[in-house]
């Protein structure tokens, strides 16, 4: 997904530094630009942040229109702070264009709003792993969304139980949110481990609590969409 403003800025680009989770179709907006892969791929190949900063500065000093293309929204787990600091250290001005973060793309694909009238007035976004490499799950909001959780689903189920979530709490897992092949499966805290197989090797977000509940109004649109979903086993 890309916003209209993002697409317009991309069309002007001379150089594009892009992340791993970028749809290749976006190249159509800037076919004449130089595209530089600076992606991080979980446990695979990753471009170090210092190297990304250096490439960004080099491109900005040589070209008038440079785009740093990120998946989702740059201000949500996008390392935006480091890159802004690098640019500001050299007196280089830039514009930050908002994007569609995975939590929102997942909510749209699953048709399960993150906030619900009367039951869901707070949302927490967090990574499944801390910066120390420890799996952590909390219960600080009505809806908890965990990013980059695909490899930790069985362990996350246990951590959610330890954090006080009842075993029957609704859980929604969406992998490759915002892509044409996005996949939604529905579970409970107790059965979350079942999501490991269908979402294997796919970037996933896990929504727990109010934002994972099914809508009570089964509209025709929702009914058609849910035909492609896996219902939870409690």
Where are these regions (language model features)?
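Class I S-adenosyl-L-methionine
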Residues: 4-97, 190-199, 233
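General beta-strand structural signal in soluble alpha/beta enzymes
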Residues: 18-19, 67-71, 94-99, 116-118, ...
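Short, acidic/turn-prone active-site loops that include or flank metal/cofactor-
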Residues: 21-23, 39-46, 100-102, 119-123, ...
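Alpha-helix capping/helix-boundary segments
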Residues: 22-23, 75, 102, 152, ...
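Short hydrophobic/aromatic-enriched beta-strand-loop microsegments
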Residues: 34-40, 91-95, 114-121, 166-173
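A contiguous loop/helix-start segment that scaffolds small-molecule binding in enzyme catalytic cores
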Residues: 51, 61-66, 79, 122, ...
């Amino acid at each position: 997904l890309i916003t209209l403003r993002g697409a317009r800025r991309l069309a002007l680009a001379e150089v594009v530094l892009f992340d791993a989770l970028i749809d290749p179709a976006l190249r159509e907006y800037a076919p004449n630009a130089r595209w530089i892969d600076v992606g991080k791929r979980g446990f695979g190949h990753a471009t170090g942040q210092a190297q990304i900063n250096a490439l960004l500065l080099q491109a900005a000093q040589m070209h008038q229109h440079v785009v740093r293309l990120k998946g989702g929204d740059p201000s949500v787990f996008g390392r935006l702070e480091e890159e802004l600091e690098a640019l500001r250290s050299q007196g280089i001005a830039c514009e930050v264009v908002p994007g569609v973060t995975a939590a929102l793309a997942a909510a749209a694909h699953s048709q399960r709003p993150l906030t619900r009238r009367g039951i869901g007035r707070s949302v927490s976004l967090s990574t499944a792993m801390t910066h120390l490499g420890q799996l952590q799950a909390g219960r600080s909001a009505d809806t908890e969304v965990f990013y980059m959780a695909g490899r930790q689903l069985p362990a996350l189920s246990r951590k959610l139980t330890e954090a006080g979530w009842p075993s029957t709490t609704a859980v929604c897992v969406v992998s490759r949110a915002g892509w044409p092949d996005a996949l939604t499966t529905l579970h409970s805290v107790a059965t979350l481990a079942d999501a490991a197989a269908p979402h294997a090797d796919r970037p996933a977000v896990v929504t727990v609590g109010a934002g994972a509940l099914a809508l009570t109004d089964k509209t025709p649109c929702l009914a058609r969409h849910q035909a492609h979903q896996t219902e939870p086993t409690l």
